[in-house]
Amino acid sequence: MSEDIHEIQARHSEENGKKDYGADDIRVLEGLEAVRLRPGMYIGSTSARGLHHLVYEVVDNSIDEALAGYCTHIEVTLNDDGSCTVTDNGRGIPTGMHETGKPAMEVVLTVLHAGGKFGGDGYPISGGLHGVGISVVNALSEWTRVVVRREGHFHEMRLSRGEVTQYMKTYGETKETGTSVTFKPDIEIFKEGVDFDYDTLKIRMRELAFLNKGLTITLTDLRDGATHEEKFHYAGGITEFVQFLNEGKDLVDPAVIAFEGEKDKVIVDIAMQYQTGYSESMYTFVNDINTIEGGMHLAGFRSALTRVLNEYARKNNILKNNEANLSGDDVREGLTCVISVKVPNPQFEGQTKTKLGNLEVKGIVDNLVSEGLRTYLEEHPAEGKAIVEKGITASRAREAARRARELTRRKNALEVSSLPGKLADCTEKDPKMTEIYIVEGDSAGGSAKSGRDRRYQAILPLRGKTLNVEKARLDRVLNSDAIRTMITAFGTGVGEDFDITKLRYYKIIIMTDADVDGAHIRTLLLTFFYRYMKPLVTEGHVFIAQPPLYQVRKGRQKYYTYDDDEQNKLLDEIGRDGCAIQRYKGLGEMNPEQLWDTTMNPEQRVMLKVELTDAVEADRLFTILMGDKVEPRRKFIEEHAKDVTNLDL
């Protein structure tokens, strides 16, 4: 296991011959016709997520060149005309004649699943499959222009909505190699809009640079007449990724523990570090794909970690003979870990096809971690003792939390009704038909109870201070009245007992005042849901109500607006003369009828659905905003101050 990742990947490139990547490596599996008819089947959706997926598809092809050892720099540029250009310095798409009688470049760009991966020689390891993504991008773009630098010349093709508008032409001379793809997404497909979000792309490009040690990715924004450019290059790879994730956290040991190695052409790269907090942050990747459902690589890591730490604790008499072994949850408390494996033929399972199913990977990861962690613990006894003692403290807290949950369950069983007294429940019993409003304070709760539709809307007023769970273990979290009330009302349990199938309401709606205090309560609730009831967020059950900020009366007409811009537009339209304007300071100022009309009536209300688009970034933000350290929070506020209308310092 003495080779580093660079050496392993270089050797793989040698073994694969620095094999010629030519026209014969392109395999045609099926046609392209269905992509424009059913784009969701290929890119997930035609929302903003699907739009950005187009960029990822093209970048994935360049990443494949990097994994194969041929590409060191990828440039992603957002152009002023709304198009995006992805350029790499890889080998370039093959341009020779294909067995179909067409240039290989044309086949790659116009036929779905025509790529260099399928024969096994072009790409020994692949995430995006060269040709799958790029043909889909072509099909879903108003226009596409591809320029290949290969064999001493430029080779160019142009396409529109899946059709060739300019066949391959060869011109000029160049000593460089690589591919440049420029595409403009089709507004006929992406009806919600075709504007790329810089921050969304930045998060993914940074992640890819972390996962591919030594690769440089440049992201440039040329829109609005300005130039904004960032370069991502991490010589330390995922070790730097873990340091980035733990920014602003108090660490058990400032050094990152790292293991890397290879067996049977499976390359494993792991970095881990303990911080003094209570949440576990595990991120797993296969061929640069985020395996959010985990899989065999995660199972191998977990089993090795739990086994080795228990062995170490017993061997060094930190755990006594009469004490039970530490559980997996105990030894992972406060752990931040990134696991990246490169697998020649990955098998993906699970609901979203993001769970690694290759059984052999479990043993490979288990052996690597067992060997590496034992060596680390022998060489770092003080840090080893601190890690084990943290696990023992976690074990005691977990036992206290279990007793608190048992006590809550026993109390509920003894009561005639196990639901909290503050809850105004609905009559409908089918969870799919019901929703619960989490409301701050009694006055707003009173208006909501009177204004709701009792058939399917439940109201739960929260009294007292909501706990910042980012700074507390579960046993202390369960001492909070507000949190215990929510857990009981939802019916799901919490933490390791959480069971989404027992959810009593399919919509959980946070309804707070439209001011700084309301925003703070929303953030506290979202932190709790994210840390201890994450499936509520990932499966789309959490919403944020949008109560109006203003009521405008003119004559007999009543209007409601939700922010200052909307208010000014309305006043410009209807004229300011004769308008009576009321600014709502809180939900309690609305009578039940107004609250129903503006915020609770499904036919008229506006709600935000809480979605988890990037778990890594969400985890980091909760730490920055809700953690103990002031400096990262101040830095974040300074960077984002231009986007803020209410700031409470």
Regions found by a protein language model. Give the residues of each.
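Residues immediately C-terminal
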Residues: D64-E65, G92-I93, V516-D517
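Conserved short strand/loop->alpha-helix "switch" segment adjacent to the catalytic nucleotide/phosphoryl-transfer site
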Residues: L37-Y56
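Mature N-terminal segment immediately following signal peptide/propeptide cleavage
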Residues: A23-R38
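Short conserved segment of the HATPase_c
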Residues: I93-G115
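GHKL-family ATPase ATP-binding module
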Residues: M1-G22, L32, Y56, D64-A66, ...
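C-terminal interaction appendages of subunits in large macromolecular complexes
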Residues: R396-E415, D430-E435, G446, S450-R452, ...
